Amino acid sequence: MQTLAENLTSQAISPTLEKLILTLANTSKEISHAVRHGALAGVLGATEQENVQGETQKKLDIITNDMLKDALKADGTVRGIASEEEDYVVEADANGEFLVCFDPLDGSSNIDINSLVGTIFSVLPAPAGELTEKSFLQAGRNQVAAGYVLYGPSTMLALTTGQGVQLFTLNPETNEFLLTNGAMAISKDTGEFAINMSNQRFWEAPMQTYISDLLLGKIGPREKSFNMRWIAAMVGDVHRVLCRGGIFTYPTDNKNPEKPYKLRLMYEANPMAFLVEQAGGKASTGYETIMDIQPTEIHQRVAVILGSANEVDACLEYHGIDYSEEPVL
């Protein structure tokens, strides 16, 4: 099997980007080790701190954030860093070519129950001049690489450099990432959807109607049955979509009118959208393509609808309907 390093060489990417990706991959091996040891290493549980999102930080959130931050600052290829766990951007190497945005441990609410978690990352070109938050405010189309590492029964790395999506599995005996799928492809049609149904009453009318029609199955307007899946970690739900198709959505809701969106654009939605599009799927907010959004802040949140192309299109058709005369279910 081809190693990650061998695969990157075959992609003919720049040596600096190759070095950066290998640094991310090597750090994820250390994170995988920390996740596996869990309670044995005393890294489970919550701290008394909150991140910039107002979310209580888990011990592993902080540990994994520091692992990635330290590795990227020492790498020499990175100009600056933006993380879910950092209030502000972090300077790295003044001569670095890239900016890295990451969620160090997506799905951290799953940590204490020994369920799926992962690391999500996005790589952008570093513009010339002083490093500021504005340096990071680039549309997702500017990404030069993106991926995630899933810490499950196996540790897996899904990666794109704009040349399709490759899946690597960590060999625990050699500690090497080996290529196990050289061309991930999302099926255009699906019978699975992933959504947090507990928020149904807070969704916009288009999403309420769309999901209601899915639940009606063969007797409804879609005339087919759908199964629901929900892992409560974007990285796990998107991994399933990449492996066997499906639609994943965390839509707009009015549960907290000041925070109508859940997922962060720069280090969750954009990298996942890049992966999904490279695998033949689609990614939208319901009203615009995710990777076309011009960010206004590094911790900006957006609605997310992504997955099998035909099913995303079907969902978007509901968002094109005038619901002004329709009752909200």
Swiss-Prot record:
Q: Which SUPFAM superfamilies match?
A: Carbohydrate phosphatase
Keyword annotations from UniProtKB, A to Z = Carbohydrate metabolism, Cytoplasm, Hydrolase, Magnesium, Metal-binding
UniProt remark on cofactor binding: Binds 2 magnesium ions per subunit.
**What cofactor does its activity depend on?**
Mg(2+)
Quaternary structure?
Answer: Homotetramer.
- Which PANTHER family does the entry link to? FRUCTOSE-1,6-BISPHOSPHATASE-RELATED, SEDOHEPTULOSE-1,7-BISPHOSPHATASE, CHLOROPLASTIC
Protein name, UniProt field: Fructose-1,6-bisphosphatase class 1
| Native species | Shewanella pealeana (strain ATCC 700345 / ANG-SQ1)
